[in-house]
Amino acid sequence: MENLPLHVFEKILLKLDPKSLAMMKCTRRSINSHISEDPYFKSNYLSLVGFGLLHNSYYGSKSLFCNPFGDSMPFRYTYSLDIKTRFLCSCSGLLLLFMDYLCVANPLTKRYRFLDHSKSIFLGRNKSGIQSCLHERYNVFESRPNHVYQFEITTGDSCWKLSETTITCSPSVPLADKKPVYFDGCIHWLRKDGSILAFNPETEQARLIPIKFPLELSAVANKFLFEATEKELALISATEESINVYSLEDILIDPKWVLVKEIQNGVLHKKTMRCWNVAAYNGKCLVLWQMNKVACDGDVFGYDLRANKWEVIGWIPEWCDGYQVFYLFKPSFSSAIELKQKVDVETMNMVHGDDCKYISTLRKLMSLIEEISPYAKRLFKKKGKRLMTEEETKLKMTVDEPSSSKCLDVMRFSKKRRFLGMEKINKRKRTVRSAGRSGVVEGFLLYVVTAQYCRNTGEKLPISMVFYGSVFDNMHLLP
């Protein structure tokens, strides 16, 4: 393989599905370096990986539903998780979960890490405080003036930092059912008065974007969704007849919502429909869901903005509640960098108690998401090949450090080496890189807790949680 020209070798790598590419990284340090650090290869490969849709109950459940976009494969789900699990965020191929504890996991690389929130000012007080944060029960502050926001950040197991930044806003609160979104280096919260609270975790600067909802949204009792695409912040306004897509323009000078797309809503079954809402949007696909009256089950519809057509992409069984939370998920292998610890799953399964249940739950979650990788399905379908069974693909992925006899010289980080005929530096870069227009930061992961309190009473309560980034050191391996 060393004799192959670089462009030929990259063509081979680009044809691999994400799981196979992650395995390829384990074969050789130079290949790992090329896949993980070359910005051109990463950009080309990630552009081929499609989005999938994940959802479970807003209050957490033992079931998970997921489906790839643009694939005819039936909607997949599992209902046998050992621990009640709730999805909080999804970013850069990572999932933030809550299963009695906070957990960051990458389904593709089978890496995970539990976060210790006991030293958090906002989350470490008591169990009820955590639940209040997770359920976003902060409407108690809705009518109080002089609201002040604070931010708490963690970059490790027990390293929590209370930012010195505070911001005072008008008496309004973030919408409880609208998730914060990450775009262009900042986390954004949509508030009830239409304004947007933005916080940059890197510079720890916060500001309020003074903007109102579009007039059409204010005048009609409709559904709406606040999302971030690769290029912009978007607001989706939907009625039973039509759906409007707005883009936020001139965010720094004169922010305003501009109508960019109008879609006819012709998929809802009004006679049998009990409730419905907008689920997700990524600039390429729009997702709606509805729950039915008689059968008590539900349907998930997807609209392809490029093909301008609707199709059924999933369903919601009758035993699910009507409070389903949807997340767009894109597999990524980038979090496999610098991860040294691993867990022997077979040994853990023989251990009785709650620890085994957590590991078992993670295994089931990762296995289900891995099986429906959008990129892998599209590749196999194109080549007319059948999908490999679990027994055929079962392979332990270890990223252990080589023995001392095989280690490179300790000065390897300052030396150049030849890789496929090209000079490359085999240094694990820790500099922060921007991953495209979306502003997702690679190289570290931050977990941000936002709190709000009233100056008059001094009462304080965490209101939301979000994380971003793609690399978290010392995560565990789940083979």
Swiss-Prot record:
Transmembrane segments: none
Chain ranges of the F-box domain: 1-44
PANTHER family xref list: BNACNNG10540D PROTEIN, F-BOX DOMAIN-CONTAINING PROTEIN
Protein name: Putative F-box protein At1g20800
Lineage start: Eukaryota, Viridiplantae, Streptophyta, Embryophyta, Tracheophyta
